[in-house]
Amino acid sequence: MKLKINSQGLKGRLKVPGDKSISHRSIMFGSIAKGKTVIYDILRGEDVLSTIEAFRAMGVEIEDKGEVITVHGKGISELKAPEKALDMGNSGTSTRLLSGILAGLPFETTLFGDDSLSKRPMDRVATPLQLMGAEITGQTDKVKLPMTIKGSTHLKAIDYVLPVASAQVKSAVIFAALQAEGLTKVVEKEKTRSHTEEMLVQFGGELKVSDKTILVPGGQKLVGQKVVVPGDISSAAFWLVAALVVENSELILENVGVNETRTGIIEVIQAMGGQLEILEQDNVAKAATLKVKASQLKGTEISGDLIPRLIDELPIIALLATQAQGQTIIRDAAELKVKETDRIAVVANALNSMGAKIQPTDDGMIIQGGTKLHAPENSINTLGDHRIGMMAAIAALLVKNGEIELERAEAIQTSYPSFFDDLEQLSENI
């Protein structure tokens, strides 16, 4: 795909697609609950479709009527063994969270995925589930896909300290804990996104959260609910950054999810001097309308507890930092190396090819700001990573002459199928 975007500024209002994390979890909770779950504004990306197809393969009736998805749950004990291995596509969320559910079911299931997902570490989720009594095997000593899970109907509760900041691993343990005998204790070193905990309560479940400790009693029964999915702040991030760095831009983004464990990017933008206003905020739905306009920005440091609250936004934040005055340092973000790609290396290579000055480090990047971007000599390959593709498309807005050749742009379908339509709406034709 060739990107040549002659933007004189981005203008308009936009409702970004539904939150990917909440969309996955709404299908999962609806499938293990008893009764009907009705989901509005779900994300229709490839990752979420992988979750839907997995539960259909286990006997769950899931109706898709366009604007509304209805899940007819019969309870977790009614899930059936799938007739064949489950295809997780590119979805790490589907794989890891589903593993927690499968750990307590009386059958054996094999999960497989695409080349990118098959390289990602699954031992981090296999280890606690094995401690609880599930049998999990992969193709190597370090568990990766394809992975086979033989569940146990006698899972035992555990006390588990998460070795890495991972909402996916935490969620897998919580899903398994619902089926375990006793009280499971999960301790986070750094707080990660809290959607699983909040949705468990919404579906009639019970848990106690105290700072970074979560207590989950076993043997719980859940009840179907109505779920309205807010817009995904990780998708909104691309437009927030675009409006900040493209001259004469002003955007209003409606119904953006602002769960406090996900709003690190808002704090970074404010720390960098960006003009960002929260116009309307619904504290119950945890959603807000955001107004953002082109701004003079300054460098900052991003590290520590902030990292899990913006881990998925770091690629586009790196682009933002190239346009700020001064130096931006990102550290404590080694987790970027085991995303869909090694995002430290891939982001640095892509933006440096356009004239940025980014030094990759073991756990982040050092970015010199105030650089003008130009068209790269060679194409930029997403390597199947949706966030790299969208970052490159936003970077193209800053290229005055020439165009960007983007390879494997279809990866963007993973999380934002309407991305290029929205880009066209907010700027000029691609």
Curated annotation (Swiss-Prot):
InterPro entries: Enolpyruvate_Tfrase_dom, Enolpyruvate_Tfrase_sf, EPSP_synthase, EPSP_synthase_CS, RNA3'P_cycl/enolpyr_Trfase_a/b
Residues the record marks as active site: D312
Claim: Membrane is one of the keywords in the record: no
SUPFAM superfamilies: EPT/RTPC-like
Binding-site positions, phosphoenolpyruvate: K20, G92, R120, Q168, R343, R387
Keywords tagged on the record: Amino-acid biosynthesis, Aromatic amino acid biosynthesis, Cytoplasm, Transferase
GO BP of this protein: amino acid biosynthetic process; aromatic amino acid family biosynthetic process; chorismate biosynthetic process
Reactions that this protein is recorded to catalyse: 3-phosphoshikimate + phosphoenolpyruvate = 5-O-(1-carboxyvinyl)-3-phosphoshikimate + phosphate
Residues engaged in binding 3-phosphoshikimate: K20, S21, R25, S166, Q168, D312, K339
Pathways involved: Metabolic intermediate biosynthesis; chorismate biosynthesis; chorismate from D-erythrose 4-phosphate and phosphoenolpyruvate: step 6/7
Subunit structure: Monomer.
Protein family: Belongs to the EPSP synthase family.
UniProt cross-references to PANTHER family, sorted A to Z: AROM/DEHYDROQUINATE SYNTHASE, PENTAFUNCTIONAL AROM POLYPEPTIDE
Record-linked NCBIfam families: aroA
Protein name: 3-phosphoshikimate 1-carboxyvinyltransferase
Upper lineage: Bacteria, Bacillati, Bacillota, Bacilli, Lactobacillales
